[in-house]
Amino acid sequence: MGEDKETNILAGLGNTISQVENVVAASLRPLPTATGDGTYVAESTQTGLAKDLSHVDLKDVRTLAEVVKSAATGEPVDDKQYIMERVIQLAAGLPSTSRNAAELTKSFLNMLWNDLEHPPVSYLGADSMHRKADGSGNNRFWPQLGAAGSAYARSVRPKTMQSPSLPDPETIFDCLLRRKEYREHPNKISSVLFYLASIIIHDLFQTDPKDNSVSKTSSYLDLSPLYGNNQDEQNLVRTFKDGKLKPDCFATKRVLGFPPGVGVLLIMFNRFHNYVVDQLAAINECGRFTKPDESNVDEYAKYDNNLFQTGRLVTCGLYANIILKDYVRTILNINRTDSTWSLDPRMEMKDGLLGEAAAMATGNQVSAEFNVVYRWHACISKRDEKWTEDFHREIMPGVDPSTLSMQDFVAGLGRWQAGLPQEPLERPFSGLQRKPDGAFNDDDLVNLFEKSVEDCAGAFGASHVPAIFKSVEALGIMQARRWNLGTLNEFRQYFNLAPHKTFEDINSDPYIADQLKRLYDHPDLVEIYPGVVVEEAKDSMVPGSGLCTNFTISRAILSDAVALVRGDRFYTVDYTPKHLTNWAYNEIQPNNAVDQGQVFYKLVLRAFPNHFDGNSIYAHFPLVVPSENEKILKSLGVAEKYSWEKPSRISHPIFISSHAACMSILENQETFKVTWGRKIEFLMQRDKHQYGKDFMLSGDRPPNAASRKMMGSALYRDEWEAEVKNFYEQTTLKLLHKNSYKLAGVNQVDIVRDVANLAQVHFCSSVFSLPLKTDSNPRGIFAESELYKIMAAVFTAIFYDADIGKSFELNQAARTVTQQLGQLTMANVEIIAKTGLIANLVNRLHRRDVLSEYGIHMIQRLLDSGLPATEIVWTHILPTAGGMVANQAQLFSQCLDYYLSEEGSGHLPEINRLAKENTPEADELLTRYFMEGARLRSSVALPRVAAQPTVVEDNGEKLTIKAGQVVMCNLVSACMDPTAFPDPEKVKLDRDMNLYAHFGFGPHKCLGLDLCKTGLSTMLKVLGRLDNLRRAPGAQGQLKKLSGPGGIAKYMNEDQSGFTPFPSTMKIQWDGELPQLKEDF
């Protein structure tokens, strides 16, 4: 208390002295004669670093260091270090006169200002969420920027004084452009790349013939050739039903005057759009696309429009990704490397020490200069040159193109276009006939696409435009003149490229250089068009130069690509899962593990799902001809990953639905063969040695039967049932204890992800000595969830590879993880094979679970067969393990889902009673409850291929099956067949156990059937003991699933960004505490 008083006295004394000093200073001031009102002029006093240092300590220095580091690196700030508060402390602690304090405060204010966009570029509301038909509203503050009907921008100031008497356009064509000798593209780029370029060009440029300063299309990559330039055109291609486009249609008429490969690409985008809206409606993320009754006209119109507009965003998103990941990669020759680098303008950037980040979502307006940059007629192939000549003769019969005036040419094209029907479904396309549903025959479209992929395009450069394009090129030259565009050199200087000083700089070909000299007198006077297309073309460079276009064009198109994508709100700030939905966003995203991030295959395989193998070279790399792709991919060591077969129709399997027919087929091993051998061998191939051919499910030969017998003997040893029951009871309980939690006092767990899936992982890793990392085995390699994903990938690749669009990605990923797991499993098996020291191995692995010795002894029994360790692992252990985990987890989750459903929950009280009774009789009934629940939620279909012609009777209908035809035994319908299961929708505990079909039937019936029944009914018993077992409220308590062909369910992963054959997540709740674990488990 005394010290406080002394401190207050001293402080007061200091204040008094300070006040006296101020009074003395004031008394010494001169009179205020500098102002008219008799006041003193206030003098600004600023202090510098010297005075600041007396107010700064080590903590402040550290604060400044961290601020400087953050500004330099752009790394996120760790706000738990209180950096902002420490900056405030530093600024507040400096003298009020400190110059540095003022600068620090300014920097702080600048940072806070820059945290937010001024003005914002992304907004809520339906009006802002979707593209407008005419492209308006991309920039909310300049809504007409880039809209259809806007005037072209001018990029370059035309300062050079040119003579009004410029060379005749047709003379220019004959001197500089006319094709004399056809040259293939030096990098063997296919015509498909230039068909895509045609779509891009006509997406951005469509000069209004009534006012050639105006473009009738938007300045955005919004697929307007498909969707239309305005609302009227868009309405013509819409069905106004379920968000769909009219089948195999596109809005623009102009494309009908191009080689049919261009139209095929647009039809492919049309099909992709319709595929997307089907999926969006089926998934209905967060109820976003809940379908109203069609009688409610206004609500249904909103539903249809929401689906259509979202589908357009998604389809345009794939279009942009194809441009950036396939088209630009090929242009830059990166496709010839294994690099995943790409020029993606959507990259997020922040201001840094090297300058400000490029702006984003600003909008765009195309310029007249770029209109002439994209005239690539030199690259038209010989095949398309002939097509164009034939087309010309068709629309202007009897007219010689070489003598046709430009006026007559324009008039002839106008008459042709005016004669096309307004209704897109009625417009002719390449002589193809529409089917009753309005679509074209897939065979015809695929044939056109195949021929386009195989057609090598022409090379860029002078003297390479087909003669048939003389009028087109002459009109282009005249149009550039009417726009008063700058010269070639002015355009180059705009990009900071050195101007051409001589005609030989423009083109080293003496003839072209001389012709330019005679036409223009001086390099500075060469017009931008035809200048940009008669320039010398770049050489090929890997990577760097793949398109091998003219020098100036090669620079301009990259700048344009960045501006078009980075300036588009819908490809940047509004390109999010929230706008597109999680599934759609993921569907169009590149995966660097597939084709180094290229995505063209996503379009091809969705448009034509019944013609291509999932690894078809025609689908994955269509922008280069197949023969050249073979050289490229061989040099990269990946050619064997792809199929080089030409596309051909793949027949659909015939679904068999009756129980009797399914059982008959599955039992008839002579006529109907299993189909999984090729997939198993693909996954198990090791060091160019084929493994897996003799695995039990790989075929129907004697070695396959021997595999089944050997694995059965190894799995089912003495007292296996008691050991399996004990394992599943304790493992399930342990996982419940480990992964359950309380929410507001209520018990909850993700029963699928954290219990059902993981229990099978533990069982499989114990039985087969797989390297699982757990508390009891900390030296394992794979975490529980990792090993589950590996096993699920293996199972899906072998048995559920049904989605052609994901097939390649799935198979490559499954093979990679299979190889990793196999190598680690080999290490364990080889130790046993070489030493036989089982006990030492058990100790080394730190295993303490109830099945650890079971698994080690099982491997020893397999080795006793005399087979090499490699054969044991790659042909028998890995395929068996891969067939167990995900399948068993699926069965249990489906069974539990039924008993938690409205129709099945009435059985829970009896299951609860039986589970607590804990008698053999009660356990038998629980097994029957499990089999019934699994039957009622079955999602299994088993394929077989007919080895010879036969007839199958299915539900009273005789089906003729040809040799080589695949039949699909639909066990979903077989499990609900009333002839085998009377009252099929009810749970009945007295059914014949031999009739259950969901484990298969016949010689390839699930080998682990008895293990599975025992283990999974034990899990049901553990869960059944919990009181008031129920779903968690809301969507988290449901299995997210959709019905596929034949009623076979497909599930969605946790974030609903993709489909999977297996349940992924479902949360349950219960009352009371969990039973105690055994101490020694």
Swiss-Prot record:
UniProt cross-references to SUPFAM superfamilies, sorted A to Z: Cytochrome P450 (SSF48264), Heme-dependent peroxidases (SSF48113)
Keyword Heme: yes
pH effect on activity, per entry: Optimum pH is 7-7.5.
Reactions this protein catalyses: (9Z,12Z)-octadecadienoate + O2 = (8R,9Z,12Z)-8-hydroperoxyoctadeca-9,12-dienoate; (8R,9Z,12Z)-8-hydroperoxyoctadeca-9,12-dienoate = (5S,8R,9Z,12Z)-5,8-dihydroxyoctadeca-9,12-dienoate
InterPro entries: Cyt_P450, Cyt_P450_CS, Cyt_P450_sf, Haem_peroxidase_animal, Haem_peroxidase_sf, Haem_peroxidase_sf_animal, Oxylipin_biosynth_metab, Ppo-like_N
E.C. no: 1.13.11.60, 5.4.4.5
Keyword list, A-Z: Dioxygenase, Heme, Iron, Isomerase, Metal-binding, Multifunctional enzyme, Oxidoreductase, Peroxidase
Active site residues according to the UniProt entry: Y374
Region (9,12-octadecadienoate 8-hydroperoxide 8R-isomerase): 654-1081
GO process terms (BP): fatty acid metabolic process; response to oxidative stress
Positions with a binding annotation for heme b: H202, H377
GO molecular function, one term: linoleate 8R-lipoxygenase activity
The keyword Iron appears for this protein: yes
Required cofactor(s): heme b
Top-level lineage group: Eukaryota
Ranges where the record places region Linoleate 8R-lipoxygenase: 105-446
Function, in words: Bifunctional heme-containing enzyme that oxidizes linoleic acid to (8R,9Z,12Z)-8-hydroperoxyoctadeca-9,12-dienoate (within the N-terminal heme peroxidase domain), which is subsequently isomerized to (5S,8R,9Z,12Z)-5,8-dihydroxyoctadeca-9,12-dienoate (within the C-terminal P450 heme thiolate domain). Oxidized unsaturated fatty acids, so-called oxylipins, derived from endogenous fatty acids, influence the development of the asexual conidiophores and sexual cleistothecia and regulate the secondary metabolism.
Family, similarity comment: Belongs to the peroxidase family.
Known partners and oligomeric status: Homotetramer.
Cross-referenced PANTHER family: PROSTAGLANDIN G/H SYNTHASE (PTHR11903), PSI-PRODUCING OXYGENASE A (PTHR11903:SF37)
The protein's name: Psi-producing oxygenase A
Annotated gene: ppoA
